[in-house]
């Protein structure tokens, strides 16, 4: 069913899109330099070697839209009925950069750049903080600065940082800052690290088609099984793309996790206070970015509850107006649809 897409809540809810990307020229130039000088990993060469250099319509259009935080983006939001966009620096952020000082500088300048545009469009944009996990203490300070001084409402990290994962205790300053500020962490996909990407590259499966979800789902699962929510019970973590497949594997994940604990298969695998299912229902938010598919959305709502799912478009990578209509036309209750499109995001991001 086709209908006109309008902002303003004419269907009983406003549309808050929760995984929307922007970039800075400085960031993309750094990627291009790394691709050309051989310091980029294989995933970055595959993904940004395409987007930063290809003359194809898709690549040039996405770069143009990533760099725009002005009239074009607002027009696209108006044309698709998006009332509010939650914006974050596009993946992989500054995490691939080998020079930590450069990474911190680009992250800080991108946060200030975003803040200027949030101030220009305060009713349309919400900011998320970019950090450089290469320096966890600096990242914690930047989370506090952006929350207190810039009014940002969350933090995005693009999965692994040069093959390192957030379950390493050295990243705890980031989690302490998140809990102190009462803000969610959004773990956005990145291309898999060199240690796992080879068989994906051989079949063209390294990006959004499969590699993103497989690697990011594993990251969240690592955090859960290593006890992140036992240590930080008030922490909220968001993941996109209908949970990076975890809701669909949840029965077997829970079963085999418990079996491994009972068998003491791994010395480092310790019992958790709750089941993995419980943590997903209580501490994790799922967004529909890139997954405008009714069976998947309804299944995830059934398994995790309608308070755990939020709408996202994944602009500019998947700017498809009919996918907004798909969400509007979901065969769920009006109350569940309002949670999906508006009030869950308002709760999680404290809007």
Segments predicted by a language model, with ranges:
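Aromatic-lined substrate-binding rim segments of carbohydrate-active enzymes
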Residues: 74, 78, 99-108, 167-182
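Soluble or luminal CAZymes and related metallo-dependent hydrolases
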Residues: 65-69, 106-113, 138, 166, ...
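Catalytic pocket-lining loop regions of alpha/beta-barrel enzymes
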Residues: 5, 118, 145-304, 308
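Alpha-helical scaffold segments that form or flank carboxylate-/histidine-based iron centers
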Residues: 129-134, 138, 238
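Short coil-to-beta-strand
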Residues: 79-89, 193-194
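Surface-exposed, active-site-proximal loop segments in enzymatic domains
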Residues: 90-106, 137, 202-205
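Short glycine-enriched loops at secondary-structure junctions
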Residues: 133, 189-195, 315-317
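Mid-to-C-terminal alpha-helical segments outside catalytic/metal-binding sites
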Residues: 1-16, 23-84, 112-120, 141-145, ...
